[in-house]
Design a protein with these regions (language model features):
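Phosphodiester-processing cores and adjacent nucleic acid-binding clamps
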Residues: 1-205
Length: 205
């Protein structure tokens, strides 16, 4: 494996330790973060995107964006980055659309093709060849059905607008034995009971 990215949610706290471990293992470290993007229509339902640092300038810009979100724009404890902040400080950053959790994915999930096209063209205009449409496959059967429908639509838009696709997997733990511990953590964060069979199950072993 020539390179590896670490993308925690809304922080770069693991960057130094990750850098040292990666270098010691002969692996190129890539810094980045999953970030909350403010939803103009509803502050309670932010979008999620993935930002990766291309160079030192990108790392500096991502650090500043995260700090600004924590200091100026928290909603229910979630630090949210405004879209125009990213557009003003995009140098050195690569952006992935967030699959079904991003604004484009949500629009496609609602079958709002024209609005999704308009949104992706806006990001392409700013980031040019540093913008990627993201696809994922994980979660329970119901979620996978939505993913498959999304993938079919996003492949069409990617080809139509000459935007590259990238497949990612939201890896949360290294060993399958850690699955139950991670589920417990997820339940605590979301206010669900581990024994509740009706609760959302967003991850698998």
């Amino acid at each position: 494996m020539p390179a590896l990215a670490l993308t925690d949610l809304s922080n770069l706290f693991g960057a130094v330790k990750f850098y040292k471990s990666a270098i010691d293992s002969g692996i190129k470290p890539i810094f980045g973060a999953d970030v909350w993007i403010e939803n103009d229509a509803s502050s309670e339902q932010p979008h999620k995107m993935l930002l990766l640092c291309q160079d030192q300038q990108g790392f500096n810009n991502l650090s500043e964006l995260l700090s600004k979100a924590y200091l100026e724009n928290q909603v229910r404890g979630k630090p949210m980055i405004k879209k125009n902040w990213i557009f003003e400080s995009h140098d050195g950053l690569i952006v992935l659309s967030g699959s079904l959790h991003g604004n484009i994915g949500k629009l496609l999930d609602q079958n709002k093709i024209s609005e999704a096209r308009e949104e992706l063209l806006l990001w392409k205009k700013i980031f040019q060849d540093r913008f990627y449409l993201e696809v994922q496959r994980y979660g329970d059967d119901l979620w996978r059905k939505r993913e498959n429908q999304y993938i079919e639509k996003v492949i069409f838009l990617a080809a139509e607008n000459k935007i590259p696709l990238v497949a990612t997997q939201p890896i949360q733990f290294m060993d399958p034995d850690d699955f139950r511990a991670h589920e417990s953590k997820t339940c605590i964060a979301d206010g669900n009971m581990l024994a509740d069979k009706r609760r959302p199950k967003n991850f698998t072993e």
